[in-house]
């Protein structure tokens, strides 16, 4: 590989974006610079990596106690996303699961309860996203919400509560209400449940590897491997196009 010198971290971020735009690299990885620097270069006005889609962060997690891969989004970028932003966050994760071979991923839109409550905005957004998916505004997935975490990942919990849902107990994607909830959930799975994880930013023209400063070498390596897979799928035309 080639090492390219720059005068400062801002220049490093700008150079990474230039290389990606030119097709010389298939993904961009955050190094020791701050997340804001690399993401700012990606979404800057006139950046050739920016798309109409909102960028969002995904953790793809292998949780020992769960039967399949589990995606948690968004745990790192969108602090308090609006309904429209949640739609993009959801679609980014769905598109990723398509690239990983899941034809119709199941999305659980998380809240504290399973009923709509006008005093709990997360339940309103969850219900709206469910309808949006049914109307084709979110494509290629089964979406249901609001669902509490236990219902999303445990069919037994769903039966106990009397919740009938095609997503309950079998979620592929957990769409969290805000960054704080997502960050805490992902780190609980990492540290309490001994999950393996890969972390990517989606919604740009190339995948962006964005890991936490505390992430292990294993997480960094799996993130790079996932980015390589996503880049290869897009090059082969197997991923959904983002304009």
Model feature map: region roles:
Residues 1-167, 172-243:
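Anion-binding alpha/beta catalytic cores of soluble intermediary-metabolism enzymes, centered on
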């Amino acid at each position: 590989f080639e090492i390219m010198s720059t005068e400062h971290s801002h220049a490093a971020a700008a150079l990474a974006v230039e290389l990606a735009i030119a097709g010389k690299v298939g993904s961009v990885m955050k190094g020791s610079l701050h997340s804001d620097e690399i993401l700012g270069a990606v979404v800057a006005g006139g950046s050739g990596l920016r798309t109409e889609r909102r960028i969002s962060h995904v953790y793809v997690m292998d949780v020992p106690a769960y039967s399949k891969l589990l995606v948690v989004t968004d745990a790192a970028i969108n602090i308090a996303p609006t309904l429209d932003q949640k739609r993009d966050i959801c679609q980014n994760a769905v598109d990723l699961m398509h690239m990983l071979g899941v034809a119709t991923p199941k999305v659980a839109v998380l809240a504290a309860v399973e009923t709509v409550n006008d005093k709990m905005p997360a339940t309103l957004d969850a219900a709206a996203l469910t309808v949006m998916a049914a109307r084709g505004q979110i494509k290629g997935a089964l979406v249901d919400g609001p669902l509490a975490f236990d219902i999303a990942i445990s069919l037994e919990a769903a039966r106990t509560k009397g919740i009938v849902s095609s997503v309950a107990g079998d979620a592929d994607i957990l769409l969290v209400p805000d960054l704080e909830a997502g960050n805490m959930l992902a780190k609980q799975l990492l540290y309490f449940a001994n999950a393996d994880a890969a972390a990517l930013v989606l919604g740009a023209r190339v995948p962006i590897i964005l890991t936490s400063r505390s992430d292990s070498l294993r997480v960094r390596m799996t993130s790079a491997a996932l980015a390589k897979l996503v880049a290869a799928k897009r090059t082969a035309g197997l991923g959904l196009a983002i304009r």
